[in-house]
Amino acid sequence: TDFAPSAKAFQEEAQKRIRELHMYDVLRADRCISVNSLEARVPFGDLDFVKYVMAIDPEMKLNKYGKGKYLLRHAFEKGDYLPHDILWREKAAFSDAVGHSMVDYLKEYAETVYTQEEFEEKRAKYTHAQPFTKESLLYREIFEKYYPGQSQMIVDFWMPNKSWEGCNVNDPSARVLANYGDSGK
C-alpha cells in the first residue's frame, strides 16, 4: 500500500486485502503450523485491533514519511518495547521468511522444468487464475494434481495492485518492489 495514489485507493485496497486474507497468508500459516501441532498467535489479527486500524483516517496511513508502517513504528517509539534498530529497520517481505535462497532456488528450478513453448502451451489450458510465470505454473500443476478441478477456490493471485505506479510486476514477492529494503538479504 506504499504505492497507493490516494487515501481512498489505500483504504479500498486495505479492505480488499482484509476480505481475502483468509485465503492467502492466514490459510497457509494455519496449515503449516497446525501440521506440526502448534497454534499461531497473531496479535495484529485481533478483530478489535483490525477494526480500530481500519477506522483510522487513511490519509494518516499513507507513506508520507519515507518509511513504511510509520504509524505502527511510531506507536512503539515510546518505552522499551523494541530496540531502535529493530523498530526502524528496512522493510522486508513477509513471504521471504523462508529465506532468499529457497525462493530463488524454486524460481530457478521452475525455469528448468519447462521450455518456453511448454510453458505457453500448459498455461493456456488454465482459464481461471492463469499462471503467468514458470514458477506459478509449477505450483498450479502441483495444486491440480492434489485438488483437480478445484481452482475456483482460489480467487486470484495475491499480487500488488498492478494499476498503481511501481506495482506492475509479475512476482507476488515484495522483493521486486522499489520500497523493499536490504533487510533479509
Regions found by a protein language model. Give the residues of each.
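Mid-to-C-terminal catalytic subdomains of enzymes
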Residues: 1-13, 20-132, 136-137, 141, ...
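Phosphate/ATP-binding catalytic cores across multiple sugar-kinase/actin-like superfamilies
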Residues: 146, 150, 154
